[in-house]
Amino acid sequence: MNRNRIYDIVQKGSVSILIFGTVGGTVLLGQSYYSHRQRRLAALQEFQQREKIKEEGFAEDEFNQLALK
């Protein structure tokens, strides 16, 4: 094997590793973003439900106070 052939193999291997790493990193980043987005949406829905329950409770308290007067 001459030196140029060795360099060619190393270069092709490096390029393959670089492409594989880039694609793999992109996939992992996409999965991470998607799971983060799902957690944020779930937290937002939970927050909205809590706020709705608070508002309903506040309206009930107000009604009860008016009924007592």
Curated annotation (Swiss-Prot):
The chain crosses the membrane at residues 13-35. The keyword Amino-acid biosynthesis does not apply. InterPro entries: COX14. This is Uncharacterized membrane protein C757.15. GO terms for cellular component: mitochondrial inner membrane. Keywords: Membrane, Transmembrane, Transmembrane helix. One of its GO terms (biological process) is mitochondrial cytochrome c oxidase assembly.
